[in-house]
Structures are given as C-alpha cells and as structure tokens.
Amino acid sequence: NLKKLLSNQNIEKIFHFARADMTFIKQYLNIKVQNVNCTKIMSKLARSYSDRHGLKDLVKEFLGIEISKQLQSSDFGGTLNEKQLKYCACDVIYLHKIYSSLKEILIREKRYELYKQAISYIDTRVDLDLALFTEDIWSH
C-alpha cells in the first residue's frame, strides 16, 4: 500500500523538490510523508556556488548525463506511455546517486546538520502551502 510506504518512518524517501510532492500527497492521500530527503534543498546548501538546482542540472553535474525535461509537463493523468515510464524511472534512478553525492558534500563542508534542521521544517512548509500561505512568513 502506497500510504503505508510513504508514512513509514523506517523507509527513507528521496524527492527532488519534496515540498511540491508532499503537498500533493497530503492533499490527495491525506497522509504525512515520513523520513524525507530533498535533493533540491541539499543542493542549495551543498552547492552554494551555483544558482542552478534543478534536477536536470544536478544530473548533468554529478552523472554527466543530459536529460530532457520535455515530458515533465505531459499528461500523467491516464495510462502512461513508454516514454513517460522511462522518464519516471530515470528520475528515481538518478535521485539516489545525486542524494549520495550531495550528502557527501554536505558532510565534508560541515553542513549536513544544517540540512537536517532545514528538512525538518518541510512538514510546516507543506501545511503553510495547503493553507495558501505562499509568501515567506519569515521575511520582513
């Protein structure tokens, strides 16, 4: 069962831009995803030398592979075609490798604990998004 898997604290989940996925999951499945990691947040803390933190950029930098995001906006509402299935599978395969590389950098740069603190805020950010608070409530 997908709900059990996503809410299981003992199983680590890796997303890229977890905030969006978790908002969708909470809204439609009414569950809180547990034990979450986000390669986008990791990238922003680990790769402070760059302003390019999209999955396409990370795949290129860490894996040396050019990926097309053309299918990203295709219709995933019905039966998926071969290209869509491959797109989804590649995202999952790439995320594990990227996660490992980013974690290594965060540990080396002594930013891993900061990342853990940042990711612990994601549940609150999801709740704010669902309550339609899209502005940064911490800004002046």
Question: Over which residues does each language-model region extend?
Answer:
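Mixed-charge, glycine-rich, non-catalytic linkers/tails in nucleic-acid processing enzymes
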Residues: E82-H140
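Conserved DEDDh/DEDDy metal-dependent 3′-5′ exonuclease domain
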Residues: N1-I105
